Amino acid sequence: VYGLDASEYLLFAASTDNACPPQASINSQGLWDELSEADLAQSRVAYSLALASNVLSRADELHAAWAVDEGNFVADFANAGLGNSVYSTSQEALNDLSDALFYVEKVVKDYKLARPIGILGCSQITCPENVESRFSRMSKEAIIANLQAAHHIFTGAQGEETSLGLEDYLVSVEGGEALALPMVESLTQTVAALEGMDSTIYDAVAEEG
C-alpha cells in the first residue's frame, strides 16, 4: 500500500494488531506475535520512510511535467489550439479545466462527506469510519485545501491576488455570470464555515451517530 493514507496510518494509528486473516502465515505461524513493540515501531519507521520517498518522487515528476524548463505543460495549456500543444483546440483545454472542478462534487461532496454523514454507502445514522484521514483527524483541513484549490482554479487567483480564470471566461459568456459569481461565493462561504468549526469532522460525525 502506497500513498499519504498509508503514511497517515503508520504515523497516527495506535493499534499494534494487523488486519491479515488468521490463515495468513504471519498469523498462523505466530510471526506477528513474535514481534516486540520496538520491532513494530522500527518497521513503521522504515515503511514510513519508503512511503515518503515514493510520494516525493511522484511530486517531483508532477512538478517537472509543469516546469517551464522541463515538461512545460503550462505552455501546452496556455497555447491550446496552437503549434505543438497537446490540445487541438482551446475548448479542449477549457473542458479539462472544468472537468477538474468536478472533483469537488464527485470526491469532496459524495465521497468525503456524503459517505460518513450517512447519505451514501452507509447503513447507520453516520459512518465515522468513512471519514477521510480518520486516524490523524485531518479531514477538515484536507477538504479546506480541496476547496481552496478549486477556488484557485476557478478564479485563477490565490489568496488576495487577482488574476484571470474560468470565472472570467464564464462572465464573458452570455448568461455565464449567473453561474460564475454564486460559485465563487459558495466556495468562499464553505471554506469559512469549515474554518469556523470547533471540532474535527470525525468527532462531529461520531457525535451525531
Residue ranges of predicted features:
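Mature extracytoplasmic or organellar-lumen-exposed domains after removal of signal/transit peptides
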Residues: 1-209
